[in-house]
Regions:
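Canonical Rossmann dinucleotide-binding motif of NAD(H)/NADP(H)-dependent dehydrogenases/reductases
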Residues: 3-41
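C-terminal helical subdomain
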Residues: 108, 166-167, 172-175, 195, ...
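Rossmann-fold cofactor-recognition segment
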Residues: 51-64
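Short, flexible catalytic-loop segment of classical short-chain dehydrogenase/reductase
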Residues: 197-208
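Rossmann-fold scaffold of SDR-type NAD(P)-dependent oxidoreductases
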Residues: 19-20, 79-87, 121-128, 194-198
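Catalytic loop of short-chain dehydrogenase/reductase
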Residues: 88-92, 119-187, 200-202
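Short C-terminal tail/terminal secondary-structure segment
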Residues: 2-7, 251-278
Length: 278
């Protein structure tokens, strides 16, 4: 099937801004969007290899860099789809920087560009199966989501025990923010805000994780039903299908794209020795 046969997904000619388009799921999403006829603007710390309408360098851990990038991107005109999906594992940058990139910078980037998103537009983020404890920590997560995002780093510097590994915490906060912020965006501007929550996926992210976690961890990782890690492109399709206008009734949702991992863990249908209470 050619990409032109998929025009019904509604991306042809639409303006898209995406972070993380230089690698992994972000690269796959940016490439697919281009093939679907979208006008793709990529923001990342590394220059992408995928074709795009423009590239803006941004360090999501640096608020000044985020401000500079979003001021520039605001000039491209109304945005139809916003995909702030860059993310890093904690062992690559440390727990605090992981938090700054995955939650603080991502939320700052998103909120800075929301005025440029068309009424009726769509925003979609990437959380993780690592956020499965978000309800268990709901009161704490709500309190932190209520903070100015730029104050969150200082909060965790003063309370390092609450940071945990930085990754699961950042993804829990994104999950809570999606559920909460979607309400006002829908009521006031008919903007849909959703997320996907992938399991371990065959991307450079997991290649780096394997170096730290070890092959035994990777061999023991449960891959129910499919028997393998999904690819970055498979996760990107979930992101794009959830965000397309055919799913106009869906907002405030976090779609589990995890081969049944979290549901299996919650119900006891799936057990894994490495899973610890969070």
């Amino acid at each position: 099937m050619s990409r032109s046969d998929l025009d019904g997904l509604g991306y042809r000619g639409k303006v898209v801004v995406i972070t993380g388009g230089a690698s992994g799921m972000g690269e796959a999403a940016a490439r697919l969007l281009g093939e679907l006829g979208a006008v793709v603007h990529i923001a990342d710390i590394a220059e992408p290899t995928v074709a795009c309408a423009s590239f803006t360098r941004v360090d999501l851990a640096d608020p000044a860099s985020v401000t500079s990038a979003t001021v520039g991107l605001a000039k491209i005109g109304p945005i139809d789809f916003l995909f702030p999906i860059a993310g890093v594992p904690p062992h690559a940058v440390g727990a605090l920087t992981c938090m700054l990139i995955n939650y603080v910078g991502t939320r700052q980037f998103t909120e800075s560009l929301l005025p440029q998103v068309r009424d009726g537009g769509t925003v979609c983020l990437i959380t993780s199966t690592a956020a499965r404890g978000w309800l268990h920590h709901l009161a704490e997560n709500l309190a932190i989501v209520a903070l100015d995002p730029l104050a969150v780093g200082a909060f965790y510097e003063a309370n390092p025990d609450k940071l945990r590994d930085g990754y699961s915490t950042s993804k829990e906060l994104l999950t809570v923010w999606i559920h909460q912020a979607a309400i006002a965006l829908a009521e006031k501007r008919r903007i849909r805000l959703n997320g996907i929550a992938p399991c371990a996926t065959g991307t450079p992210f997991m290649e780096e994780s394997a170096k730290v976690l070890g092959q035994a961890f990777m061999d023991a990782y449960p891959h129910p039903l499919l028997g393998r890690m999904p690819s970055g492109e498979e996760q990107a399709w979930s992101l794009l299908l959830l965000s397309c206008p055919l799913n106009a009734a869906v907002t405030g949702a976090v779609l589990a794209t995890d081969e049944g991992n979290v549901g299996g863990m919650i119900t006891g249908a799936l057990t894994a020795a490495y899973v610890q209470a969070r």
